[in-house]
Design a protein with these regions (language model features):
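Membrane-embedded helix-loop-helix hairpins and adjacent transmembrane boundary segments
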Residues: 209, 251, 258-270
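Membrane-embedded translocation segments of transport machinery
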Residues: 75, 79-224, 228, 241-242, ...
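Transmembrane-helix boundary/entry motifs in multi-pass membrane transporters
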Residues: 1-11, 28-32, 39-52, 79, ...
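Membrane-interface helix-loop-helix modules in multi-pass membrane proteins
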Residues: 1-36, 143, 160-181
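Inter-helical loop and helix-membrane interface segments of multi-pass membrane transporters/permeases
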Residues: 1-2, 15-71, 100-124, 191-195, ...
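Generic alpha-helical transmembrane segments of integral inner-membrane proteins
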Residues: 56-64, 86-90, 167-174, 255, ...
Length: 270
């Protein structure tokens, strides 16, 4: 059905991006950002065969977590990492807004351009944000909802998810977009902005090496917790339809997603 296909399609795309995050976490540990041109570093990686091993690693981590049943451990770690991410965001926000020309980015975010409301692409991008950010693609929420305890206040939980999702997105926008203006980057570049703007900010701040590691580690936990949802939902649908085992369903879905995403690996950010 459509919700299942949509969550699988998201899983296909998301695996590529999680691979990028793993690569940048590794690069932040090595301190690569301090010795290279950051934009060229990204362009030499994204859209090339170099992404394949990181994408493969992302898929292996995801299926291992699902099959070994260590999701509870990820949830417990997220109770630490997600608040830590908000603290890191706050520090980065303060540093970003003190960069030269950053206020132009703030104006870009806050001054409305009403004519864009009449352009279909605006609504498509807004739906895409909801689609990815809040997982409003049906199946994932249904599968996770089936695991809830009977006494969970679902409307209140949903409200909290929406609020914290919106707050984190707004914080990220006020870090990345002003940062893009400060370093002369195109604010409409899309997902690649995270991987170009943030290393620039880390280079320009005290203890940037440490904050870079913590930032990308937090993003890994956020990304893994999301992609687990996508695999769980897709594998659950496969199990129900083909009456097979959890292991087989998870393996087939993961393998199919990786293979389908190879053209994305070789073309994204190009």
């Amino acid at each position: 059905n459509i919700p299942t296909l949509s969550v699988f399609g998201t899983f296909v795309f998301y695996g590529v991006v999680v691979g990028w995050v793993l690569k940048y976490f590794y690069a932040s540990i090595k301190g690569d950002f301090y010795n290279v041109d950051i934009a060229n570093y990204f362009n030499s990686f994204a859209g090339t065969s170099a992404t394949l091993k990181w994408h493969f690693l992302a898929m292996v981590i995801t299926i291992v977590i699902v099959l070994l049943g260590v999701i509870k451990g990820i949830e417990r770690m997220n109770k630490i990492m997600m608040p830590a991410l908000f603290v890191i965001f706050t520090v980065l926000l303060i540093r970003t807004l003190t960069l030269p020309n950053a206020m132009e980015g703030v104006k870009y975010l806050l001054i409305p351009r009403w004519e864009y409301l009449f352009k279909p692409i605006t609504w498509v991008m807004a739906l895409g944000q909801a689609f990815f950010s809040a997982s409003l693609n049906g199946a994932g929420m249904v599968v996770y909802g089936s695991y809830l305890k009977k006494d969970v206040d679902i409307p209140n939980a949903a409200l909290q998810v929406a609020i914290f999702d919106a707050v984190s997105a707004i914080l990220a926008a006020f870090i990345i977009i002003p940062g893009a203006f400060a370093f002369g980057l195109d604010p409409t570049s899309g997902p690649s902005l995270l991987f170009i703007t943030m290393p620039h900010i880390f280079k320009a701040m005290p203890f940037g090496y440490l904050f870079g590691i913590l930032f990308f580690l937090s993003i890994i936990f956020a990304a893994i917790s999301s992609i687990i949802n996508m695999l769980e939902a897709s594998a659950d649908a496969y199990m129900s339809f083909f009456k097979t085992t959890r292991f087989k369903a998870s393996f087939i879905v993961t393998a199919a997603a990786f293979i389908i995403a190879i053209p994305l690996d070789l073309s994204m950010a190009r």
